[in-house]
Regions:
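Short alpha-helix in the alpha/beta-hydrolase fold that links the catalytic acid
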Residues: 243-253, 279
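C-terminal catalytic histidine-bearing segment of alpha/beta-hydrolase fold enzymes
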Residues: 258-324
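An N-terminal hydrophobic leader/cap segment in hydrolases
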Residues: 3-58, 65-69, 287-302
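The serine-hydrolase catalytic nucleophile loop
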Residues: 86-99
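Short beta-strand/loop motif that positions the catalytic acidic residue
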Residues: 227, 233-239
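Hydrolase active-site cap/lid region
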Residues: 165-214
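Alpha/beta-hydrolase active-site loop
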Residues: 123-144
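Conserved alpha/beta-hydrolase
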Residues: 97-119
Length: 324
């Protein structure tokens, strides 16, 4: 009997150590704000001649900043909601937003909680991204001019996770498009952690749950089974940020006979399947050079780099899916 209690104490100590380590890892990545680098020359709305109507809406008792973008609206019954990825803001996706606007759509995009122009002392956790999207859709639906429009949600990476799982909270969304998405927080963490520490993904997800609520536990593998709208997922097999096999590959195995879910794989696009191969190549060369420099020279490189070539788009297939 004594050995039983000794074993129990040892197990509890190990669990406590794992939780403390999980808190430390979670805080390292999410217990801070993200502000867009002022030296990075992103595309701007003015370059594309877009109109911009800036708004704010509530999420977790804070104000998130977003905007409605348009050019020549040809599809007035549709609204695209665009969700940015991790460690970026809507500024980094202005070329994507402009593409849809130039093709006749109105787009609403926003900075997530704790990101750039939005309030929030920190990002809080990955689950907060889904909560922010939930709040954004509720806000849009509260506006008389938009409440009856068909909503199409597009997201990249973290935004892709949000796009796939928001269907649980808003099942009437017409379409969702996910670019290099992770299907759950647990799965993306498994891919990012060293293999021997993969079990820590469960503990970090628990910490995310305590901070963000049930949004942190959502899994597209389950939620897409109940979704009657159309879903399109595009993911590069060589993605080094969101592991394909642990996310989209797993989804493909579990949802093989769902005619409303289209999964497409590409290669040589790494974590940006919406970019041309040349843009991805240039981006990787830039990042490799950037990481080899000290801080002073990094600033010089950023100020001298034309980021437009690094973000050239390849969105023809996505546009066809939206219009079908």
């Amino acid at each position: 009997m004594v050995w039983f209690y000794i074993a129990l104490v040892v197990i509890l100590i190990l669990l406590l150590i794992c939780l403390i380590l999980a808190i430390s890892i979670h805080n390292k990545y999410f217990f801070n704000r993200f502000v867009a680098d002022s030296l990075t020359r992103y595309y701007t709305k003015d370059e594309f001649g877009l109109s911009e109507h800036v708004v704010s809406f509530s999420c977790n008792k804070r104000k998130l900043k977003g905007a409605f973008y348009s050019k020549n609206i040809e599809y007035p019954n549709n609204l695209i909601i665009f969700c940015h990825g991790m460690w970026s803001s809507r500024k980094a996706y202005m070329q994507d937003i402009a593409y849809y606007c130039q093709n006749g759509f109105e787009v609403f995009s926003y900075d997530a909680y704790g990101v750039d122009e939005s309030e929030g002392n920190s990002i809080v956790g990955l689950g907060m991204g889904l909560k922010a999207l939930d709040s954004a859709i509720n806000y849009v639906k509260s506006i008389d001019a938009y409440k009856d429009k068909n909503i199409i949600v597009i997201g990249h990476s973290w935004g892709g996770f949000c796009a796939l799982n928001i269907v649980k909270y808003h099942p009437n969304i017409k379409k969702v498009i996910a670019l290099a998405p992770f299907i759950s927080i647990n799965q993306v963490l498994k891919g990012m952690l060293p293999k021997k520490l993969g079990f820590m993904a469960y503990f970090i997800t628990i910490i995310d749950f305590f901070k963000c609520g049930f949004y942190s536990l959502e899994n597209a593998k389950k939620n897409l089974k109940k979704y009657n709208g159309d879903a399109y997922i595009i993911h590069s097999l060589d993605d080094n940020m969101v592991n394909y096999n642990l996310n989209t590959g797993l989804l493909k195995k579990n949802l093989p006979n769902y005619s409303n879910i289209l999964i497409e794989t590409v290669n040589n696009k790494i974590h940006n399947p919406q970019y041309t191969e040349n843009a991805v190549k240039l981006l990787n060369e830039y990042l490799a050079k950037l990481h080899s420099l000290d801080l002073t020279k990094q600033k010089e490189l950023k100020s001298q780099t034309n980021f437009h070539d690094l973000g050239e788009l390849d969105l023809d297939k996505i546009e066809k899916f939206i219009l079908k």
